[in-house]
């Protein structure tokens, strides 16, 4: 099943629905970063959440950045997603592995930690100037989905129900990943409360998002199960999603500049080359002696 995003409305436009399947891109992230199972789940949930949030952006080129920094052994999670359906991300300590929780599931909450913060940065592209909106909230549980739902309630004040999940097989890698976001858009507070209660109740009754995907159900099927009796209208447009990083050799050289003239000269003398690795995708860039010398000359010219 291809990675994709679809949108829908229900309750006469009072409910906005977005769903994503992110199985392949989560598996790509697992392989690129050599992630443990619990790190895969944490990063995968955050990538699905970021893509769901990015779907509400308006202008081409706009992006959402999510940073989750908890007190657990993973250290932190950083994800960047765009309105164009691209996403990238990493965790601070990708090799961390923990025993399953009491329910026998990957213990993402303990890996992330229940103390810390969630920072969401929205960048809307504009003509001549980008509009930045940053919000920071406390971590609720470290399970990611609950934390992002809390952010939506506290910072954007949009009544929301969110469920994200990742299933990692013992030997097969990621076999199911994705999420669903339900938001109440009506202006009547009393109606909001009733709708949110119904949505949360229905989400709780689901056997979980990834079990439905593993059972062969698509996003449209899940939407029907949740909202089929509430005037559901699924939009025909389907957006394809992918893991994608905009790093480049030129950017890697720019990063090496921050080492400074003295350290670059030391590298030239001792190693004759330098290696730069992109944190988001683990792409490796190698600069040879000639390129390093040109960097030094450029820095010296800038200081004159």
Swiss-Prot record:
Report which gene this protein is encoded by: hslO
Among the GO molecular function terms of this UniProt record, one is: protein folding chaperone
Q: Which family does it belong to?
A: Belongs to the HSP33 family.
Which controlled-vocabulary keywords does the entry list?
Answer: Chaperone, Cytoplasm, Disulfide bond, Redox-active center, Zinc
InterPro entries for the chain: Heat_shock_Hsp33 (IPR000397), Heat_shock_Hsp33_C (IPR016154), Heat_shock_Hsp33_N (IPR016153)
Q: How is it modified after translation?
A: Under oxidizing conditions two disulfide bonds are formed involving the reactive cysteines. Under reducing conditions zinc is bound to the reactive cysteines and the protein is inactive.
NCBIfam families (alphabetical): PRK00114.1
Provide the protein name.
Answer: 33 kDa chaperonin
Q: Where in the cell is it found?
A: Cytoplasm
Q: Supply the source organism for this entry.
A: Microcystis aeruginosa (strain NIES-843 / IAM M-2473)
């Amino acid at each position: 099943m291809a990675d994709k995003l679809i949108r829908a409305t229900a309750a006469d436009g009072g409910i906005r629905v977005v769903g994503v399947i992110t199985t392949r891109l989560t598996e790509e992230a697992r392989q690129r970063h050599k992630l443990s199972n619990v790190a895969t789940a944490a990063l995968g949930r955050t990538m699905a959440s970021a893509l769901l949030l990015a779907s509400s952006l308006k202008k081409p080129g706009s992006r959402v950045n999510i940073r989750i920094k908890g007190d657990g052994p993973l250290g932190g999670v950083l994800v960047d997603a765009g309105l164009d359906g691209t996403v990238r991300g990493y965790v601070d300590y990708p090799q961390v592995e923990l025993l399953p929780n009491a329910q026998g599931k990957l213990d993402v909450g303990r890996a992330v930690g229940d103390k810390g913060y969630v920072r969401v940065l929205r960048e809307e592209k504009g003509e001549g100037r980008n509009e930045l909106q940053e919000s920071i909230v406390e971590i609720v549980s470290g399970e990611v989905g609950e934390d992002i739902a809390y952010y939506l309630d506290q910072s954007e004040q949009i009544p929301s129900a969110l469920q994200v999940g990742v299933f990692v097989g013992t030997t097969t890698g990621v076999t199911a990943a994705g999420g669903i976001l339900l938001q109440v858009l009506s202006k009547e507070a009393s109606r909001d409360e009733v709708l949110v209660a119904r949505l949360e109740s229905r989400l709780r009754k689901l056997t979980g998002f990834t079990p439905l995907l593993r059972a062969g159900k698509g996003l449209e099927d899940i939407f029907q199960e949740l909202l089929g009796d509430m005037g559901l209208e699924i939009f025909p447009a389907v957006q394809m999603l992918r893991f994608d990083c905009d790093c480049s050799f030129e950017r890697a050289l720019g990063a090496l500049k921050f080492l400074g003239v003295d350290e670059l000269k030391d590298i030239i003398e001792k190693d004759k080359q330098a290696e730069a690795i992109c944190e988001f995708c683990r792409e490796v860039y190698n600069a040879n002696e000639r390129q390093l010398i040109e960097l030094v000359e450029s820095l010296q010219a800038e200081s004159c």
